[in-house]
Regions:
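Junction motif at the cytosolic side of a transmembrane helix
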Residues: 144, 211-232
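Short alpha-helical transmembrane interface motifs in multi-pass membrane proteins
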Residues: 52, 60-65, 95-96, 122-130, ...
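Hydrophobic alpha-helical transmembrane segments of multi-pass membrane transport proteins
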Residues: 47-113
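N-terminal Sec/SRP start-transfer signal
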Residues: 1-21
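Hydrophobic alpha-helical transmembrane segments of multi-pass membrane transport/permease proteins
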Residues: 14-41, 50-66, 158-170, 208-218
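Terminal transmembrane helical anchor/hairpin motif
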Residues: 170-215, 219
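Transmembrane helix segments
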Residues: 35-42, 148-188
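Alpha-helical transmembrane segments and their short interhelical loops
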Residues: 90, 98-150
Length: 232
């Protein structure tokens, strides 16, 4: 099993390195954050806001978008068929898709607060749990998109909508109460709310909401992937 996972992770890394567009999209949130901080946040008053928006961009562009593109590329280049014939299961394939996006999110979780000088010591546990569960949710969502996309071009088109929604929903919610309610019940709502309030304890309600998202999207993802396997 570990040999298969190592081979799958190596394949993911090779796809990432060879795809300049994907690599640029992955790095874009960090570049945008640096530019915004240098030109719009000279007094440090927007540190918390920039952290919230930058993390949602890392989620959507870094951890989410890359998954659907990689999945679609596997199908387009018939890598998925080769993996099936080599004995890789849907569960192993899904797990291999979690690793790189999670590492990218962990990098953002650690480096962005340090760069923006945001002290998370009072609510670090809630911050980590909310973000990890949100990351798993968006990975599952993009796996679904990749599973129903026959080509990378289709995956790019289908992925752009959730990417834009996740990236800009918190900003639009500041001006619209209806959008704010949608945000509250989304998988990014708990950590956006945590940063907006400047702290807080781990909420059982928010935890239940995030676990529900993970469960629903995870089951849907495995169902679609297993059907994809049967169809090959």
């Amino acid at each position: 099993m570990f040999r298969k996972l190592n081979a799958l992770l190596w394949l993911r890394l090779q796809v990432l390195i060879s795809n300049s567009t994907l690599l640029a999209t992955l790095l874009m949130p960090f570049g945008i954050t640096i530019l915004q901080n240098e030109f719009l946040n000279k007094n440090g008053e927007l540190n918390m806001f920039l952290l919230s928006t930058s993390l949602t961009m890392v989620l959507s562009m870094g951890s989410g978008y890359m998954v659907s593109i990689m999945m679609a590329e596997d199908k387009e280049k018939r890598n998925l068929k080769s993996l099936i014939l080599s004995g890789v299961t849907a569960t192993e394939y899904t797990f291999s898709m979690l690793v790189l996006p999670m590492l990218i999110m962990l990098l953002g979780m650690i480096l962005l607060p340090i760069y923006l000088k945001v002290d998370l010591s009072g609510y670090l546990f809630a911050y980590v749990i909310y973000l990890i569960l949100a990351t798993i949710s968006i990975i599952f969502l993009n796996l679904l998109i990749g599973a129903v996309s026959d080509t990378q071009s289709k995956a790019q088109v289908y992925s752009i909508f959730p990417m834009l929604i996740v990236s800009f929903l918190p900003i639009i919610a500041l001006q619209n109460d209806t959008v704010q309610k949608l945000l509250d019940y989304s998988f990014i709502g708990p950590f956006v709310g945590l940063l907006k309030e400047g702290g807080g304890e781990l909420s059982l309600g928010n935890l239940g909401l995030l676990l529900s998202w993970v469960l629903v999207l995870g089951l849907a993802c495995l169902f679609v992937l297993k059907n994809s396997y049967k169809g090959k």
